[in-house]
Amino acid sequence: LLTRKEIASAAAAYFLMFMGVSLFVVYLPYWLEQDLGATPSAIATMFVVGGIANVLTGPQAGKLSDKIGRKRIVILSSLGLAVVMTLTTFVISAIWVAYAVFFVTMILVAMRMSPFSALLTALVDDERRGSLMSLAVALGQMGFAVGAALAGPLYTRFGYVSDTVLGTIAVVAMAAVVGYLVPEPELKPEQSPVVSAAD
């Protein structure tokens, strides 16, 4: 599968996507605890808020991507996520601000997932989609592990801002890979109910 340029590019983008999220998320709770005095229950609630954002956004992102294009959604959400990640350490001054930032973060993360998965499956025929998704998930897990491994030493030496900066770089790199190297499948025009009934 990886011998095809577009599939190798999509796989690399999947790796970068999870690496960026890992760099941002892994030390976020510890930073909130150290800098803002956030309690474990407050941090747990923040992740609940983020989960709600994810659940609410995912299906809508899939529908929107069918109308305006999967690549466009992936790129726009990635660039938005890059902005949020860059500003995180500068705008979070209280735990309620962290809730708002994390809510927006998870909206943008969810906006990438469904459209990008659909973009991946459109690259191969039906018989090879399972293999491609398994490969992508494995690379995503590897990317998350690499991000987590880098986050610790960076945090120890330079602080959480270094994690957010490197995470931002990974997210922007993913957007660039998708934008320039991953093809957009043709969108199928929606049929009206009258035409569908006539068929």
Regions found by a protein language model. Name each.
Residues L1-A12, V195-D199:
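Juxtamembrane intracellular "pre-TM" segments in multi-pass secondary transporters
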Residues T168-D199:
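Multi-pass alpha-helical transporter architecture, strongest
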Residues I7-V48:
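Extracytoplasmic gate region of multi-pass secondary transporters
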Residues R70-F116:
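C-terminal transmembrane helical hairpin of 12-TM major facilitator-type secondary transporters
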Residues L123-T156:
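A late C-terminal transmembrane helix in Major Facilitator Superfamily
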Residues L32-E33, L64-S65, P153-G159:
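Interfacial helix-cap and linker-helix signal at transmembrane-aqueous boundaries
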Residues P153-V171:
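A membrane-interface helix-boundary motif in multi-pass transporters
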Residues G51-P59, F144-A145:
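Residue-level signature of mid-helix packing/kink "hotspots" within the transmembrane helices
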